Amino acid sequence: APTSDRSLEGVSQKKLELYNKYYTALVHLEQRVKHTKWCILRYPNEYFSRKSNMSLNDFKDFYYKVCNIDYNKMKIAMEPLKELMNKTDKVHIVAPGTDLIFSIKDIPAEKYYGTFNIPDGEVATCPVKNSVNGYITYNTKTKYNDIIFEDIRFDFIDGKIVKATAKENSKTLNEILDTDEGARYIG
């Protein structure tokens, strides 16, 4: 189990790109995910309790409760949302720092209920590629290749991120989005 979220600190961006290209893409995504049975479980420890701002005992109690829910019951309870999403065309999200509209028409919704991840629970789909317009701001920190990004804002026109900013590391964020022609699109 991890003890830090900075385990890759000091590794060059070039080496991280090679790792993602030759290990993550080829070994993990192409071989392991597609050809083996797997389930991801992040065992509760001090690191995860700190990240959750909880004591270790409180975090363990919370974690085991969400891991031991009735996933078959969840699967059934998700069906009305899946049906609604499958007949929905336009989605409009409005929140502080966000006004985003897109289509999910004819993109099938999928239910996730403990088959590959524990804990789990979501009904997911994605936008029609060129339908995303507006902007979204993320109010939580995120990490990519050991770089922390905070207050990310993406502005979209016809599905493409045309402007990307962050509190810090905006230049790096845009370099990541410029890695290939699909990186500025959702889906």
Task: Place the predicted regions along the sequence by residue.
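Generic secondary-structure boundary/loop-capping signal
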Residues: 115, 133, 141, 170-174, ...
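Dual-mode signal for accessory low-complexity, basic/Gly-rich regions
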Residues: 163-187
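General structural feature for long, well-ordered alpha-helical segments within catalytic domains
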Residues: 77-81, 132, 148, 152, ...
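Active-site bordering "gate/hinge" segments
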Residues: 1-133
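Short, solvent-exposed amphipathic alpha-helical segments in soluble enzyme
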Residues: 108-109, 152-155, 178-180
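Oxyanion-binding "anion nests"
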Residues: 122-164
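Short, catalytically relevant binding-site loops at active-site mouths
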Residues: 108-109, 142-144, 169-170
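Short acidic-glycine loop/turn motifs at beta-strand connectors
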Residues: 96-97, 104-106, 156-160, 165
